[in-house]
Amino acid sequence: MGSSPQSSTRTLLGLLFLLLVQLSSALKFDLHASSGHNERCIRNFVFKDQLVVVTAIVSGQRGDGQVVNMHIKDALGNDHGRPKDIAGETRQAFTSVADTAFDVCFENKLVSHHGVANPYKSVELDVEIGADARDWSSVQAAEKLKPVETDLRRIEEMVAEIVNEMEYLRAREQKLRDTNESTNERVKWFAFGTMGMLVGLGVWQVVYLRAYFRYVDFPVSWRVDGVVANCCSCCEQVEASYLRSSRVVFWSPLVMWTRLSWLILR
């Protein structure tokens, strides 16, 4: 006995929904009380114009010596809610203004011990973003949609969110690639310029030293047996050559490069 087309369609939609739906599970943790300002934050990312619904369930009750405050903020400095002294279930909804990360922060202030050695409260947090945050029951009732049509609408929005996320990742990857290529290009030309400058400085130094030794021309003669001849007679000439070369040494390439580097680094 064959299955009906409606049953096959429901099965196909159910499988597609399981493939596309984002797995969301509530986060549960213990928030210990303290007298100072000690926040515990959970971060998530949201795209522009997406609906975000934050649901927090805090154990205990008001007036038990612990005050739990919640603060929702994004990386751009916008505040999306500051409920104070929450207990039980608390819901906060907002629409993002840009592609950014947002934090859901909790703090548990200790007012009085009430005989408890290590007071704390349990927090169960559930964050729904985009298609998961919409109330599809109200959408179905308002637009008079069939269950299959409602599932198709939800899957359509989830696919659109996935496409937008892929487009965002592609644009970000392209931006990072362009930055990497431009940095590589600047480093390459800087290396070529440094090598050319060093080669030019070396050639300049060789030419300078060659002209320098020709200009000094020390008149010292050597005998075959290694004893210096005419040493005393040439001392005055060596001193005069040194004094004449002092002006040339001042314009030495190495001296000029050292002074220029010192001025730059200073």
Swiss-Prot record:
Residues 39-129 form the GOLD domain. InterPro entries: Emp24-like (IPR015720), GOLD_dom (IPR009038). GO terms for biological process: endoplasmic reticulum to Golgi vesicle-mediated transport; Golgi organization; intracellular protein transport. One of its GO terms (cellular component) is endoplasmic reticulum. Keywords: Endoplasmic reticulum, ER-Golgi transport, Golgi apparatus, Membrane, Protein transport, Signal, Transmembrane, Transmembrane helix, Transport. It is found in: Endoplasmic reticulum membrane; Golgi apparatus membrane. The keyword Transmembrane helix applies. It holds the Pfam family EMP24_GP25L. Residues 27-188 are lumenal. It is a single-pass type I membrane protein. Coiled coil: none annotated. The chain crosses the membrane at residues 189-209. The keyword Manganese does not apply. Residues 1-26 form the signal peptide. Residues 210-266 are cytoplasmic. Constituent of COPII-coated endoplasmic reticulum-derived transport vesicles. Required for efficient transport of a subset of secretory proteins to the Golgi. Facilitates retrograde transport from the Golgi to the endoplasmic reticulum. Belongs to the EMP24/GP25L family. This is Endoplasmic reticulum vesicle protein 25. It comes from Aspergillus fumigatus (strain ATCC MYA-4609 / CBS 101355 / FGSC A1100 / Af293).
